Amino acid sequence: DQFAADDNWAAAQKLASRYRQDFATYQRFQQRADFIGRVHQLITSMTQLLGSPDDLIKPSTKKLATGLITDAKSALAFSPTLTKLSTALNERLTSYTTPLDIIVVSDNVTFVEVKSVGQVGTVAQKTIQLLPGDYVFVGKRKGYVTIQVPVALRPGDSGKEISVIAHEQI
């Protein structure tokens, strides 16, 4: 209990694991050990996600982060560390699920599309919305070499200009 009170969940987890067998018949100890294990696991998982934020581009990781934040709600009062991590992960998740305004610049003759997303069309300039992620912009024009422009969009990239112009003749 002292380790938990000190917000040292790793040490509390180690101690609870060590004595779990000795107190196998004590339901209260087992419940407390389960709770300590749960808080420790939440802290560990959230720390890992915050350490590699670009993983939040993947839908499965977004779902995992949402689940962790939800699971942590009942334990926030017991751990300032968990509260801090949960808040940080929630803010990070929000930044990766907020669409960005991206400005596509072309020459009014190149047909532009975003691979696996959709068509932009033949435009001089158009603002589209995309979530943070990795994209390939494709420019096609009859009689010209098709170009591909790989773009990594991250939170804060709103307003970024992407130029897609097929200019090399076949």
Segment roles from a protein language model:
Residues D6-A24, R28-Q41, S45-I170:
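Short loop/turn and low-complexity linker motifs enriched in small/turn-promoting residues
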